[in-house]
Amino acid sequence: MENYKDKHQEIRQGVRALCGQFSAEYHRKVDAEKGYPEEFVEALTKEGWMSALIPEDYGGSGLSLTEATVIMEEINRAGGNSGACHGQMYNMNTLVRFGSKEQRERYLPKIATGELRLQSMGVTEPTTGTDTTKIKTKAERKGDRYIINGQKVWISRVQHSDLMILLARTTPLEDVSKKSDGLSIFLVDIKSAMDSGMAVRPIQNMVNHETNELFFENLEIPSENLIGEEGKGFKYILTGLNAERILIAAECIGDGYWFTDKVTSYVNEREVFGLSLIHI
């Protein structure tokens, strides 16, 4: 039977080599300053790790979600925090699978090179939590645009992303036979949105990356930014959410390895009464 770790050894070694360029002091300093590891994320992007899920035709590596979990696991095993950038992995999955040919051609090459970042997803709302079908943010079609009104909360990495995937209801809940119908997803240009109807209020509780409340007041989004079919967004967004859970699980495994390595090293090196702890 093929060994899982051997199969991905090249990826593991490559990620470890890059992470080795950033000391523990670097990450501690960023965390102490409640900053963002910009240099670290840029290095991951330059080496192609952040474009792992982008097809080769668009400048990426064309890898699968399995390989993406290996990348996230190794970042955390090396003492980094992939929470600063993992959003690009699971958001990318949604755009690659359901974006139009025009959307993929327009955005994926620029995301692959790092010219653009897609690290943010706007789903959660103050009164709905994980009951996604009951979101209140609305998108009303008017001509060649959608008008967005509503509120989101716990939306991470807005300050470090150029694009955001936004879930909104395009058909009122009372007008659909199935509550998961009538939801749509859009690709939002964050900078443009902040100048024309989207307000961002940071929540001061996160280390390594900001999370925020978002307020939408008559934000206009071009209809061409609709991803997939109108009303089918619930199915599309699950692709990203499911990938997110898998990636975070891999990160936790990496954390477990890191802590185990640290404890093992400590009990071997720490001496008490002339013996290392492991021999007491």
Where are these predicted regions, by residue range?
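Amphipathic, small/basic residue-rich leader segments at the start of a protein or domain
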Residues: 1-86, 106, 110
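Glycine-rich beta->alpha junctions and the first turn(s) of the following alpha-helix
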Residues: 2-7, 77, 197-278
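Short Ser/Thr-interspersed hydrophobic loop/turn segments at strand-loop and sheet-helix junctions
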Residues: 48, 71-76, 167-170, 187-193, ...
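Structural signature of FAD isoalloxazine-binding scaffolds in flavoprotein oxidoreductases
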Residues: 62-74, 131-135, 215, 221
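N-terminal glycine-rich flavin-associated loop
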Residues: 83-102, 129
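A short, Trp-centered hydrophobic/proline-enriched beta-strand micro-motif
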Residues: 114-123, 167
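A structural signal for short hydrophobic beta-strand segments in well-ordered beta-sheet cores
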Residues: 137-140
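A short core secondary-structure module
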Residues: 144-145, 149-197
